[in-house]
């Protein structure tokens, strides 16, 4: 038996690890995944009954989910249709004759859910988090991070070869010739290599405060003179914006050589491949499995989800908040909700007490940290109501699965653009109630705990207080800690980017977070090396979360370190 003081992780988890099995359709296992699988089993068995017409809820939104699920689960019909439902969608992109034609259709394609490689979106402003503004992001890359593109990276050649083979197999299902496939993928790889020179690395993207680069509209337009940006955004948001936030500044400074007629062949190839890939979840099962081959290679997942799981997860996508609300109604009692709400209050009080006893912060900074704690908004279990747009998600069983998917996506796309220049909706949840997860949003200064994570072993009304504090208490404290991690520390109580620290205190904070970076940097993690800078925000939240949860547990009369 391993002693705690020799190897804490092995002492706690060693026996479990000897018998733990990673499911073939998942890349990892553990406490979170065990609970997620329980919920998955519940949802699969429940929706099986719904598909058979047994116990379908008296709820129009869930009835539309069932109709959509029925189309997704009808693999015989999907097999018989083959790629035909997607042909017009793909052909429209293949038949684009020029960069000018593409540029003139960007807005229409964007609103219709067609590929544009036009990475713009609407999100809260960093400087005034109460209002939604326009952001210019950058494209993704084939490899997991820009660092993989270094010539001496040991996985570069192997992963690119796996990606290419996966796309070759996929495109062959869509009647592309070998010559067309080779030409298409050569061009996509060429363009991807260009993207990799300019887009941010994961480490760069992890430093939120360094991502804020506002551009006046005329200055930004000058970066891409061949794109009719004013026309595009007049269609998307109803007018020309006055500014855009550009986190991917390096990419956009080079974008004039990407969004140009001279580069049309490569852009066109990328658009065609994107169009094909966009259709793959909705066609035959063979195509679905082929489309996921590269991602499974990246994550080390031996096999694809089976048909039953794939149909459920595809169907729940547009309706996930409604399904989460149903789950919460079944599994999360009002008593449990009230108890968890009180635990959040308790944990915030623990943080205030820890701040009061802090010996390296000045009173000025401590007081501002307490102000931030006082206005953190906790959301427990489930949202009070569903977004209005859910009532407009109507499924037509006379249309194909792909046609319905397109119709449903139009509603969410229109909503995302309608948020521009509008007040931020603080009641909007970023994940459904049946997801085993939790989060802190620094721009809204809120913490969210879906009903799914408020289940055993993380939480149970009938567990000891120590077990609950060691489970959900640590999760709650982890999320609160994110308000003061290397990113959260840059945002004030209103969620705006604002330095509320004294210079001396922030320097002391930086010195301490650097120690966390140094502690984790280069450690072995399942055959790879930890990047201390990339993981520091999570490590800080873990350390702070466990410390605060333990302090809270010790205040209870029935405290048990072992149960914690």
From Swiss-Prot:
InterPro entries: MetalloPept_cat_dom_sf, Peptidase_M13, Peptidase_M13_C, Peptidase_M13_dom_2, Peptidase_M13_N. Coiled coil: none annotated. Pfam families: Peptidase_M13, Peptidase_M13_N. GO terms for biological process: protein processing. Residues 1-564 form the Peptidase M13 domain. One of its GO terms (cellular component) is plasma membrane. Zn(2+) binds at residues 478, 482, 538. Keywords: Hydrolase, Metal-binding, Metalloprotease, Protease, Zinc. The active site is at 479, 542 (proton donor). Its EC number is 3.4.24.-. GO terms for molecular function: metal ion binding; metalloendopeptidase activity. It comes from Streptococcus gordonii (strain Challis / ATCC 35105 / BCRC 15272 / CH1 / DL1 / V288). The keyword Zinc applies. It comes from the Bacteria. Its cofactor is Zn(2+). This is Putative zinc metalloproteinase in scaA 5'region. Binds 1 zinc ion per subunit. Gene3D superfamilies: Collagenase (Catalytic Domain), Neutral endopeptidase , domain2. Belongs to the peptidase M13 family. It is an enzyme of class 3 (hydrolase). PROSITE patterns: NEPRILYSIN, ZINC_PROTEASE. The keyword Transmembrane helix does not apply.
């Amino acid at each position: 038996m391993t002693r705690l003081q020799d190897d804490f992780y092995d002492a706690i988890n060693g026996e479990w690890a000897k018998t733990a099995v990673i499911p073939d359709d998942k890349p990892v296992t553990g406490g979170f995944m065990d609970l997620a699988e329980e919920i998955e089993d519940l949802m699969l068995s429940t929706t099986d009954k719904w598909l058979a017409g047994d116990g379908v809820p008296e709820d129009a939104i869930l009835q539309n989910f069932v109709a959509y699920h029925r189309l997704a689960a009808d693999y015989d019909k999907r097999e018989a249709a083959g790629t035909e439902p997607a042909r017009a969608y793909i052909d429209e992109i293949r038949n684009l004759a020029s960069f000018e034609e593409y540029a003139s259709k960007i807005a229409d394609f964007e609103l219709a859910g067609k590929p544009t490689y036009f990475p713009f979106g609407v999100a809260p402003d960093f400087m005034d988090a109460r209002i939604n503004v326009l952001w210019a992001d950058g494209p993704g890359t084939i490899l997991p991070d820009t660092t993989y593109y270094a010539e001496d990276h040991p996985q570069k050649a192997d992963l690119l070869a796996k990606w290419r083979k996966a796309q070759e197999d996929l495109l062959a299902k869509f009647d592309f010739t070998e010559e067309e496939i080779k030409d298409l993928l050569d061009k996509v790889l060429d363009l991807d290599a260009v993207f990799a020179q300019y887009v941010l690395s994961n480490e760069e993207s992890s430093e939120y405060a360094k991502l804020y680069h506002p551009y006046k509209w005329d200055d930004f337009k000058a970066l891409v003179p061949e794109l009719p940006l004013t026309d595009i955004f007049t269609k998307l948001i109803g007018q020309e914006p006055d500014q855009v936030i550009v986190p991917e500044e390096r990419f956009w400074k080079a974008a004039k050589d990407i969004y140009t007629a001279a580069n049309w062949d490569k852009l066109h190839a990328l658009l065609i491949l994107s169009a094909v890939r966009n259709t793959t979840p909705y066609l035959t099962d063979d195509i679905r499995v082929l489309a996921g081959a590269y991602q499974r290679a990246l994550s080390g997942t031996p096999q694809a989800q089976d048909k039953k799981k794939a149909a459920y997860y595809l169907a729940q996508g547009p309706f996930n908040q409604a399904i989460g609300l149903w789950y919460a109604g079944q599994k999360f009692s009002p008593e449990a909700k009230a108890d968890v709400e009180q635990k959040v209050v308790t944990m915030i009080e623990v943080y205030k007490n820890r701040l009061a006893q802090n010996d390296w912060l000045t009173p000025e900074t401590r007081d501002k940290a307490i102000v931030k704690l006082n206005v953190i908004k906790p959301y427990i279990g489930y949202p009070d109501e569903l977004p209005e747009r859910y009532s407009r998600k109507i499924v037509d069983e006379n249309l194909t699965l792909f046609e319905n998917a397109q119709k449903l996506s139009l509603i969410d796309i229109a909503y995302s653009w309608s948020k521009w220049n509008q007040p931020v909706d603080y009641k909007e949840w970023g994940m459904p109630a049946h997801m085993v997860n939790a989060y802190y949003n620094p721009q809204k200064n809120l913490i969210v705990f879906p009903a799914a994570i408020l289940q055993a072993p993380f939480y149970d009304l009938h567990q000891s207080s120590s077990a609950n504090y060691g489970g959900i208490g640590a999760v709650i404290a982890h999320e609160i800690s994110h308000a003061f991690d290397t990113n959260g520390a840059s945002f004030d109580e209103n969620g705006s980017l604002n330095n509320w620290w004294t210079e001396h205190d922030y320097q002391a904070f930086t010195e301490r977070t650097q120690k966390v970076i140094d502690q984790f940097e280069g450690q072995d993690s399942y055959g790879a090396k930890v990047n201390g800078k990339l993981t520091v925000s999570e490590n800080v939240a873990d350390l702070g979360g466990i410390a605060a949860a333990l302090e809270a547990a010790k205040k209870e009369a029935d405290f048990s370190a072992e149960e914690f």
